[in-house]
């Protein structure tokens, strides 16, 4: 925990924060490396020096001098002795000896930064520096392993600094995986080598005909004019451009974090260098590290335009919850349908035609939509994020990765849930997927589509096929009326959202709950008590205190506080415990000795327990106990 860093916005592992120094520093940011060593005119962050070039006593005196001059408004990076990551930990004892004698006094007087190596001891600090970060460029696996090791061991509300690594081309990816602070070392070095930096990559100055930038340097000169300048003047101007390009990229990254679509940006930006693409893909494989930080829903649309969208956390989480938490209605006929451009699907023109064709037999049918990248979407979850909030490039062509992923989702579902009859009103790749799964599982699927899904012939065939199944002698005629359909809708959303805790909303204790309202503005009642409301914007439930008391029995999505009655948002220091399953934007139940509250989580459960600053829960209702 630190009192000098406050997180303001989150987008997965990326975040916008403030280093509470003088002046404040907004992160993610790039420090001016040359200014870190300016002891005469120290800025908000000062490097006390290296143990390679000065002894311990000299550096301790330097720390004291800096602190007396700047007060607590300056963060002092404690003396360090940097080693390449390959050097064994037992060979780095000298830096341990320094922090053991100098750390306590420095910490008591003001903010400090400490060097941290993989698997090394974590000491209390306000900024952690990733040792040897610059040597890990082009080694995505080693970089990510080191980063995750450090992130899992330091407090979640503390900033992490990766020195000597940032360029305009990789700054977005570094922020995406969780780096808060960078520097302009590489930008300065590039200038001395006549290298011109952009977010789209680097260029040698002698290869440029015109500048693809309109910064203060580029707008005032041309590549030919810059090449004609003396070396010192050329370096000065090129360095200014490179630093501006890095700062501009980080400003864009901060905006992407605010709007919640940094992922879409890095899916394109990572193409600049192969190691960045590898870093994105490896990050998706580290599901638990990233998933903990990804919100339950976003305000922005999810754009699935690349192959990496199939492994995106929101997509994988949705698919997993379908398999692990979703319970379909008790019906014997499954109807597989293709997705639609308009969301939710049931409002699209094509799905309206399917529904009209089913007519009175729709109540016997369970509808599941096949789609990429989400895999399958039961009709009851078509409103739930991200099912109604994604868009993808539609070409009519599915690559093998898409087919394999969606086939796997459908196969897992049909292996777990049995139907007496399966009808598929699909064509093209959708039909190929159904045929693959049917052959593998040994089930019969009836296909009803002709040349066009929405043609009169196809719709008539769909109607007649379903009618024939539902009127056959051996058909059990399990069905759901309008009221039961609405109840199944709410039950599915609750199960997706709360897991096993959702069952308490429909337990015998509640009796026979009633769903009121028209789609999508459903409300769940037990008698005259409102238990929950479906929020159409993201397709999840907002609990009332009465509903919270029921879900509370599962002991999931619970935040525990001390004996006080909240009067607004609950801050992280006020949290005693929080469920590890809690993600940002989750609906949570706050329980204390004097109050029961419901609200929205503003950070993960782990962050709530381990953070010293920031809003943990945005409280909506408070019930005094």
UniProtKB/Swiss-Prot annotation:
Q: Which Pfam families match?
A: DUF5591, PUA, TGT, TGT_C2
Which biological pathway? tRNA modification; archaeosine-tRNA biosynthesis
Q: What's one GO BP annotation on this UniProt entry?
A: tRNA wobble guanine modification
Cellular component terms (Gene Ontology) = cytoplasm
Annotated signal sequence range: none
Q: Which reaction does it catalyse?
A: 7-cyano-7-carbaguanosine(15) in tRNA + L-lysine = 7-N-[(5S)-5-amino-5-carboxypentyl]formamidino-7-deazaguanosine(15) in tRNA
E.C. no: 4.3.3.-
Any keyword NAD?
no
Alphabetized, the UniProt keywords read:
Lyase, tRNA processing
A molecular function (GO) held by this record is: lyase activity
Q: Could you tell me which residue ranges the PUA domain spans?
A: 556-624
Assembly information from the UniProt record: Forms a robust complex with the archaeosine synthase beta subunit RaSEA. Formation of this complex highly increases lysine transfer activity. The complex likely consists of an alpha(2)beta(2) heterotetrameric structure.
Q: Which family does the UniProt entry place this protein in?
A: Belongs to the archaeosine synthase type 1 family.
Q: State its role.
A: Functions in the biosynthesis of archaeosine, a modified nucleoside present in the dihydrouridine loop (D-loop) of archaeal tRNAs. Catalyzes the addition of L-lysine to the cyano group of 7-cyano-7-deazaguanine (preQ0)-modified tRNAs at position 15, to generate q0kN15-tRNA, a q0N lysine adduct identified as 7-N-[(5S)-5-amino-5-carboxypentyl]formamidino-7-deazaguanosine.
Q: Could you identify this protein by its name?
A: Archaeosine synthase subunit alpha
């Amino acid at each position: 925990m630190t009192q000098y860093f406050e997180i303001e916005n989150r987008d997965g592992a990326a975040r916008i924060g403030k280093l509470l120094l003088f002046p404040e520093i907004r992160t993610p940011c790039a420090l001016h490396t040359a200014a870190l060593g300016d002891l005469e005119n120290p800025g908000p962050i000062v490097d006390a020096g290296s143990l390679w070039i000065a002894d311990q006593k000299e550096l301790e005196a330097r720390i004291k001098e800096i602190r007396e001059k700047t007060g607590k408004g300056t963060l002092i990076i404690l003396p360090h002795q940097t080693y390449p990551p390959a050097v064994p930990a037992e060979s780095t004892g000298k830096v341990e000896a320094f922090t053991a004698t100098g750390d306590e006094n420095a910490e008591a007087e003001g903010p400090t930064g400490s060097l941290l190596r993989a698997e090394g001891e974590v000491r209390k600090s306000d900024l952690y520096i990733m040792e040897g970060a610059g040597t890990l460029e082009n080694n995505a696996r080693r970089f990510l392993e080191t980063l995750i090791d450090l992130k899992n061991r330091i407090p979640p509300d503390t900033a992490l600094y990766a020195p000597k690594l940032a360029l305009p081309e990789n700054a977005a990816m570094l922020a995406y995986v969780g780096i808060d602070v960078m520097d302009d070392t590489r930008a300065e070095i590039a200038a001395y080598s006549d290298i011109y930096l952009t977010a789209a990559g680097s260029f040698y100055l002698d290869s440029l005909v015109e500048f693809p930038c309109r910064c203060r340097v580029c707008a005032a000169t041309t590549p030919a004019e810059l090449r004609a300048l003396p070396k010192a003047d050329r370096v000065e101007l090129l360095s200014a451009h490179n630093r501006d390009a890095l700062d501009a990229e980080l400003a864009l990254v901060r905006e992407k974090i605010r709007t919640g679509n940094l992922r879409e940006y890095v899916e394109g930006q990572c193409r600049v260098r192969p190691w960045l693409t590898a870093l994105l893909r490896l990050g998706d494989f580290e599901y638990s590290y990233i998933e903990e930080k990804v919100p339950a829903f976003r305000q922005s649309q999810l754009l699935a335009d690349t192959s990496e969208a199939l492994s995106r956390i929101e997509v994988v989480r949705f698919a997993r919850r379908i398999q692990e938490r979703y319970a379909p209605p008790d019906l014997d006929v499954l109807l597989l349908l293709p997705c639609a451009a308009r969301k939710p699907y049931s409002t699209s023109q094509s799905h309206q035609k399917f529904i009209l064709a089913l007519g009175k037999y729709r109540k016997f049918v369970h509808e599941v939509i096949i789609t990429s990248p989400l895999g399958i979407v039961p009709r009851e979850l078509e409103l739930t994020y991200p099912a109604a909030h994604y868009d993808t490039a539609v070409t009519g062509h599915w690559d093998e990765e898409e087919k394999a992923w969606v086939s796997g989702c459908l196969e897992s579902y049909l292996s777990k849930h049995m139907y007496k009859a399966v009808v598929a009103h699909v064509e093209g790749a959708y039909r190929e997927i159904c045929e693959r799964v049917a052959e593998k599982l040994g089930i019969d699927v009836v296909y009803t589509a002709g040349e066009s899904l929405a043609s009169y012939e196809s719709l008539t065939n769909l109607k007649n096929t379903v009618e024939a199944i539902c009127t056959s002698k051996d058909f059990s005629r399990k069905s759901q009326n309008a009221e039961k359909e609405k109840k199944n809708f709410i039950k599915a959303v609750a199960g997706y959202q709360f897991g096993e805790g959702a069952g308490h909303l429909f337990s015998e204790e509640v009796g026979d709950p009633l769903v009121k309202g028209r789609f999508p503005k459903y409300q769940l009642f037990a008698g005259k008590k409102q238990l929950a409301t479906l929020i159409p914007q993201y397709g999840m439930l907002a609990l009332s205190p009465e509903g919270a008391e029921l879900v509370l029995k599962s002991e999931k999505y619970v935040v525990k506080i001390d004996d006080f009655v909240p009067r607004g948002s609950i801050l992280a220091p006020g949290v005693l415990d929080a469920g590890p399953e809690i993600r940002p934007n989750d609906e949570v139940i706050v329980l204390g000795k004097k109050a029961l509250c419901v609200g929205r989580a503003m950070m993960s459960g782990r962050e709530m327990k381990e953070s010293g600053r920031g809003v943990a829960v945005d409280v909506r209702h408070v019930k005094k106990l």
